[in-house]
From Swiss-Prot:
GO CC annotation: extracellular region
Organism: Homo sapiens (Human)
Main location: secreted
Name of the protein this chain belongs to: Putative chemokine-related protein FP248
UniProt signal peptide: 1-23
Subcellular location: Secreted
Glycosylation site positions: 29
Keywords, sorted A to Z: Glycoprotein, Secreted, Signal
Length: 208
């Protein structure tokens, strides 16, 4: 994606972009489409309706998609029609370049609506192409100075966050097999300590 664009609209990751909203049907299933592992073009052509269930497994069921599905770039999260993705009533999400490389991927972050002032975001990278497509890459907590709906995930080089160093391997199977313990809304045990049962924000980085 360093030479292509975001998974959402194909806009350049070098310049910020404003993508048109799209109406999403029910996600259907969580598998990667045929050819998604073949290379970058197929990964960029990943159908939008497939994304919510992959990225937002809520208590073992697909998250409810919204009519507003837009993206932003250049390492910062936007809000409103400039970049949020309202997948669930309790989440706000946004797409940015991968904080590991700055241009090599796309991230999506989530913030629980009832705890808007959390100071920690958890990161994870997911392989999007190749033999390990769809497997978890790695994760690391990031402390932020002023987390908000507008800036959920500053870039790793931002003064508002710590440096993010992640290995380029995919050791953990994907997708998750179930929700994390707690209030029933969260991620699988592959993401220990991350989930809405604690109100943490979290992010997935699709590295290609």
């Amino acid at each position: 994606m360093g030479t292509g664009g975001s998974l959402l609209c194909g806009c350049s990751l070098v310049l910020s972009c404003l993508c048109p909203s799209a109406s999403l049907p029910d996600p259907g299933n969580s598998t990667w489409p045929p050819g998604a592992q073949a290379g970058l073009p197929a990964a960029l052509a990943l159908p939008l309706p497939r994304l919510p269930r992959i990225l937002f497994p809520m208590a073992g069921r697909p998250a409810r998609p919204s009519s507003d599905f837009v993206g932003c770039a250049q390492g910062m999260c936007c809000h409103g029609r400039q970049g949020t993705v309202h997948i669930h009533t309790s989440s706000v999400s946004c797409w940015t370049p991968c904080p590991v490389t700055g241009t090599g991927g796309t991230a999506v972050s989530r913030k629980d609506r009832v705890l808007p002032h959390r100071r920690q975001v958890s990161l994870a990278c997911v392989c999007a192409v190749g033999e390990r497509a769809g497997q978890l890459w790695s994760q690391k907590p990031v402390q932020m100075a002023r987390p908000s709906a507008r800036h959920l995930l500053p870039r790793g080089s931002s003064p508002n966050s710590q440096a993010v160093l992640l290995p380029s391997v995919c050791p953990v199977p994907w997708p998750p097999v179930g929700p994390s313990p707690g209030q029933g809304e969260g991620l699988s045990p592959a993401f220990p300590g991350v989930g809405t049962d604690r109100g943490d924000s979290w992010a997935l980085v699709l590295q290609v």
